[in-house]
Amino acid sequence: MINFSRNSRSIIANWWWTVDKMLLTLITLIIVIGIFLNFSASPSVANRIGVGSFHFIKRQLLFLPLAYGLMLFLSMKGLKAVRRTAIIGYLITIALMIMTLFWGEETKGASRWIRIFGFSLQPSEFIKPTFAVVAAWLFEGQKKYRDFPGDLLSICLYGFTLILLLLQPDVGMSMVMSAIWLFQFFLSGLSLVLVTVLGLLGVGLLVTAYFMFPHVQVRFQQFMASENNLSFQVKKSLEAFQNGNLFGMGPGEGVVKMHIPDAHTDFIFAVAAEEYGMLLCLAIVALYACVVVRAMLISCKDNNLFIILAAAGLSASFGLQGIINMASTMHLMPTKGMTLPFISYGGSSLLATALGMGMLLAITRKNVHAEDKDETY
């Protein structure tokens, strides 16, 4: 029997008394909401494409225990283990992304998926958490060791990773990674002038992407189009918000999900709006916001730059992806093909988000790993 007393030296007891329970609870609530919404959204999509009604639900429930277990396992680790996990994960992800360029499965004009042991994997999903931690490690190294070119290495890795993402092409993921990297760079001490210059370069890259990639042009033009010329999925998504009103039509009573091809992935927020109303949508927004704010507040109390930068990168990535998904669902920005973390269907997204949140829970634990803080390398 596990002893959970404060005096116990067991790994689990030690974890229990040091992990931030509020952060863990918020993340768990998002996962639970995701399970219910998948039960609502997935069967209609499965029936439409001719597979069993519970096809997507079964697959999601297969990945969910693995993802939650991965998150809890990583949350028990110290700073050294988190850094090593991120570095190894980043290198593996880069290798898989290169393989995807040659042997990937093309979907909607992009080669982002690779089949491994019968499962389709999207390697770029794992770039967000791993690169955020690697960048934090490099930025801290620049400040801690005078001869260590951390900033230069970070810039080189960022440029290389960005090229791989654009070759797929995955403009949405490129935007998220760029925003998080620039945010971390600013927190590490980069002057506001240079941040502005890099931001303007980013805008220039977006304009270039518009002219280089036809699918980017199509999505932007659909976003700017009049109400009558909106894309089919966006029209139906807005209809779902109108149908749901404040309290929703009731669990399983939604009709728009019968017509939206991506109701279980990119547009699952619309299903939530139609069946449970704006109250649940506001609750989901609040949960994501609370995760980001809570992680930021905890990390700011620490004097370790790596913890501050890594927590900022991981939590901001989590929140930004949620904002992009929800905003595109409500036609507040062009669609990006980005999932709602822990809620949308998708094994790659689920595992990658669990990886990121596991590392976030680990680095925001109480001072149990204080002896690890001064040994960055």
Language model features by range: what are they?
Residues 1-5, 11-12, 326-377:
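A juxtamembrane structural motif centered on a specific transmembrane helix
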Residues 11-27:
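N-terminal membrane topogenic signal
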Residues 17, 259-260, 342, 351:
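Residue-level "hotspot" positions that anchor or transmit function at local structural transition points
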Residues 26-32, 36-40, 47-233, 270-328, ...:
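Hydrophobic alpha-helical transmembrane segments of multi-pass inner membrane proteins, especially
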Residues 42, 241, 245, 330:
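Short, small-residue-rich loop/turn micro-motifs
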Residues 117-127, 167-169, 245, 249, ...:
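Glycine/serine-rich anion-binding loops at beta->alpha junctions
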Residues 170-175, 249-253, 263-265, 282, ...:
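Transmembrane helix boundary and interhelical junction motifs in multipass membrane proteins
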Residues 222-269, 278-280:
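TM-adjacent membrane-interface loops and short helices in multi-pass inner/ER membrane proteins
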